[in-house]
Amino acid sequence: MRNEEFPTPIKDIINYENINYHILLQFNKEENNISLSINQENSSIKYEKLELNLQKLINFSKVFKMCESLNDAFTIFQNLFQSKKVGIQKITSNSIIIFLKVEILGKEQKFQKMNQN
């Protein structure tokens, strides 16, 4: 049985309407989830974390038919960030919509994940 490496946090900056947003994607082993936090640059505004629990991530990943585990789901997010296929589509006072573009079998499909309450 091989030991899976513990995923490292992903840090990135996404520009949306000429404002830079700092993105932090973290794997939380104890809570068995991946958290995504978005903070606006040069601002005291701290957006709530998007909490994606294990089951939601597995369901999400099954849409892509790429993985069955939390670690694989994290890898999908990591690849999306590194390939710049993630963008902030809409930000309001209490919601953030993350725009994901994933290429499957040469066809580009677009998915939206809506955040917390």
Predicted regions and their residues:
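A structural signal for beta-rich interaction modules in eukaryotic proteins
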Residues: 1-114
